[in-house]
Amino acid sequence: MLPYNQKMFADELNELGTYWLEKLPNVSFEETLLSCLTHRPYGTQPGHAYFYYPQKYGYGEVWIRMAKELAPQVLYGMEAADLDCEKRRVRTKTGEVFEAEHVITTVPWHSFTQITGMPRDIRGLLAELRSSAIETRYVPKCLSTKAQWIYEPDPQIPWHRILVRHNFCPGSRGYWLETRKERVQMLEDISVKFPGNAEDNAGRNDILLNGSDHGDAGYHYLNEYAYPLNTIGKPEAMNRLLAFCRARQIYGLGRWGEHCHYNSDVVVELAMQMARRLLQS
């Protein structure tokens, strides 16, 4: 795992805490070996061992249906810029101003241009929050593999993970390359071959198109806020930040509001729990 994590986090790997390991199965060497031999899971499963998504459609279906129910209260194309903690006021980058009894923020805290009404020591916590940027790039071809996810620890290969879409979702085509922002340029220059014999690399070399193919593969998007990093001291910093804001009816929610590595199914559950609490208050 070390080569993969060095590739994922680069120099930031040494800044990470250990509290996030609760997301991983707790297994011994014997249990790992037994899992490989029997093709069955062993060991203690993490708190989030199962993922819950709609049985039909994609997980985006949740947001599509919510938007229909909430329209016209849903406003698109507006980006929050300033937050006033005393007045519970949000100003967008285009100048619109909103005030509310309760403010729920799901955006990265360090993406606000300005936060007022917050003491300097609390505001200083924002500088401690770290995140990574990831490019997702679509390649319109199929791979000769039955895998849904492929993890790539080789530092000579730009991407760290592949979502094999045609195995993941019935009727779909192609696959997605996930590449850390700092390694994206390598996609344009790639001209490598995997080491080892052909049998070991069955399906692996299919991924290596030439540089022009990757450059013109199709849709690609750089997400500047892909993952919050679980750095040392982050839980304590977020507890202080969220407690201060909560006392002023401002709530951080979800992956970015809580700066916690949640998947979307967990965020939906947390949002429903918060809605119930606010309705009862």
Give, region by region, the residue ranges found by the protein language model:
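Conserved strand-to-helix beginnings and helix N-cap segments that scaffold or border functional pockets
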Residues: 187-190, 231, 264-265
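A conserved FAD-binding loop/helix module that cradles the flavin
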Residues: 253-279
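Aromatic-acidic/polar surface patches that form glycan- and anion
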Residues: 52-59, 96, 128, 260-267
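General small-molecule cofactor/ligand-binding pocket signal
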Residues: 73-77, 216-219, 251
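Active-site-proximal substrate-binding core of FAD-dependent oxidoreductases
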Residues: 220, 279-281
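FAD-binding beta-loop-beta segment adjacent to the flavin cofactor pocket
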Residues: 223-259
